[in-house]
Amino acid sequence: MKTLNRRDFPGAQYPDRIIQFGEGNFLRAFVDWQIDLLNEHTDLNAGIVVVRPIATDFPPSLNTQDGLYTTIIRGLNEQGEAVSDARLIRSVNREISAYADFDAFLRLAHNPEMRFVFSNTTEAGISYHAGDRFDDAPPVSYPAKLTRLLFERYQHFAGAADKGWVIIPCELIDYNGEALQALVLRYASEWELPQAFITWLTSANTFCSTLVDRIVTGYPRDEVAALEAQTGYKDAFLDTAEHFYLFVIQGPASLAAELRLDKLPLNVRIVDDIKPYKERKVAILNGAHTALVPVAFQAGIDTVGEAMNDAEICAFVEKAIYDEIIPVLDLPRDELVSFASAVTGRFRNPYIKHQLLSIALNGMTKYRTRILPQLLAGQKAHGALPPRLTFALAALIAFYRGERDGESYPVQDDADWISRYQTLWARHRDGQMSTRELVTAVLSVADHWQQDLSQTPGLVELVTADLDAILTCGMRDAVKPLC
């Protein structure tokens, strides 16, 4: 069986127009996959040069396959049907190591056709590294590397206003474009680069903040033989991802035409502010996960997919989304309903086995950031606590007992919470503390909740009643009235 290369598998090639910091699975099944579709169906005509931003030889370079690789996109489509689509990605031209070939890295700035910079250098990538110097070849941090590359471009084109770049980071931090720009400006200042360059940075370049959403499951180790039998070639860079994707870019409206999204819209939104979309994702997708986990797990279920195939648990989650979360969010209802429908479809994806215990990590913080705002907004709007979001809090407290059907399971959270719960549940088991006292002790940790939740009218009473029901009747019977 042949290995992928451009000689044996000839096809379209595109001129270098995009620099991409990061060679990982996510960008390849998200940004590069979208660029490849735009290249095929529009006149975008943009090839990608991947920059490996760290000093490592693992994984091997994409150059071993001439930049070619396959994405396998699978899940439930908009009609609820299971689909699996293989696509040979031809838009990556080559990979460069910023460490092994620094001169080639700098020469990317000399190409007049270069226009876009994408990146995913992990959440820690957009950060300041105190030791970075202009003369380093290269500097350590991604923002410092980008500053050096931008200065190279500024010098090469004598500060031409039309040679700036559109910079679109995909790192999972809030307002990533603004954070990246601030660090680039900091390095430019600390390195005492000319004021004219600093002016050019802000006037000729556009830094866009983004929200990215797609579960990328990466190299399908257990299925490689079967998948390569289908494609007919060996591919060391096979990349799998879910069917759903969403790319929200905070930037000028003109960006839609420049990326040819006017000719092939994809699920990309060019917006003035990503904040409402971030809130929607956190509240609906992440919030539903956080509400689901302690309820489903204590009902004897182990994965998200199994939970969504359980009629009662599925009903609980969907009612929480549609009746308690969506009504308090600040976006058009039809948009929210459409997004929620996609979310529940994603949860049902038969190709992804999402373990509930893996999502349970840091559940206390997740509840505070993902569910509590909607719980309090619902109470304010309707004068009553939303029953399912409140029940989810009781289920979360019960989850921290660390035991299901007589079997212990790992609970992963901040050490303070682990210690606190061990003490509280031990005292409760020994009859030294009532359920109400336990609930009050949890809700009154103001440092965590950023307020004393035990003072929220009715919350202690309702959570106590729910927790008593869980402890007395078991999760199945306790949750039934809310399904």
Curated annotation (Swiss-Prot):
> An example Gene Ontology cellular component term from the record?
cytosol
Keyword annotations: NAD, Oxidoreductase
* Pfam families membership: Mannitol_dh, Mannitol_dh_C
Which Enzyme Commission number(s) are listed?
1.1.1.58
Which pathway does the record list?
Carbohydrate metabolism; pentose and glucuronate interconversion
InterPro entries (alphabetical): 6-PGluconate_DH-like_C_sf (IPR008927), 6PGD_dom2 (IPR013328), Altronate_OxRdtase (IPR023668), Mannitol_DH_C (IPR013118), Mannitol_DH_N (IPR013131), NAD(P)-bd_dom_sf (IPR036291)
Note the SUPFAM superfamilies from the entry. 6-phosphogluconate dehydrogenase C-terminal domain-like, NAD(P)-binding Rossmann-fold domains
Which residues form each disulfide bond in the chain? none
Q: Which HAMAP family match?
A: Altron_oxidoreduct
What this protein is called in its record is Altronate oxidoreductase
- What species does this protein belong to? Klebsiella pneumoniae subsp. pneumoniae (strain ATCC 700721 / MGH 78578)
**Which gene is annotated as encoding this protein in its UniProt record?**
uxaB
